[in-house]
């Protein structure tokens, strides 16, 4: 399974992964990049939740539409940087833990109902107020806008990562060595996941052992490297596989369109080059790395889940929004695409459908 980058339309991937779980599909190897890393870990090593519940709850991190129309930023995911901001979040956490009727953490427990007695809109409004009051050390010398996923350890059980059944690979680009770095499940820590999600400008490069990394998906939106023969060893890191299933949410020309406003223009300035990178990567892999050098026959079958076919035509301008309605709609679209894919290729995938209702 190859899980590509992309956010906030990552709920398409979350929906498809939830469908795979419901259909009893298991993978021997998972290779992820960008936001796909988080989606893959939610499906294999979630903390304090079942994989399906964790994926479905990801669709709930969008901002209530009534607020998003006025302030189109996901302050629930993107937090202010700096030591003071971190102390503020910790202090607020301690206060909320002592308040009856409220869940443990409005900042860390991103996948729980933070205000148990409150509506979703009130919950999001409280998030906005607390985020607005948060201090920040952001200045002209900062290397990125946001804190590196402060909720990560409360979402992923990193002690379970080495024990997960499938092999798991993630990528990040090493700025000091000028090469892509691949880590396997025995190497992955929270720091490595933060490195794999450190998209330039949004986040400062992540430092690991004195070296600096940015998001691998900024350059390789699909992490095919584990399936490519290493010239030094003569074998691919992931070993021999006969079928690749690809979850790609960037290689779609309909993502390139006229922006609706200045903020949308900025978002699309990030996405536009990634569309062609994703398309080119898939063609390059199939033509150069997935061909028998003697016969020219494909080395393995490559199946792509058509995640975006079910997106309503009139909804495409909103596909990159962090609004609650968009993220929930895309989850439903991704789930249906995943189910259809499993029904079409069930025998090949070894699907064994479970009784698991769709809810998001």
Task: State what each model feature region is.
Residues 2-6, 36, 170-294, 334:
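Conserved catalytic block of serine-dependent lipid acyl chemistry
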Residues 7-140, 146, 152, 185-195, ...:
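Patatin-like phospholipase
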Residues 26, 72, 240, 298-301:
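Short loop/turn motifs at secondary-structure junctions
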Residues 26-27, 165-167, 239-242:
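A general structural motif
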Residues 131-136, 207-211, 314-320:
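Flexible glycine/proline-enriched surface loops and loop-helix/loop-strand junctions
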Residues 147, 282-360:
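C-terminal helical/tail subdomains of lipid-metabolizing enzymes
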Residues 147-154, 192, 226, 333, ...:
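Amphipathic alpha-helical segments that form well-ordered structural scaffolds
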Residues 157-169:
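A short alpha-helix-loop-beta-strand transition element characteristic
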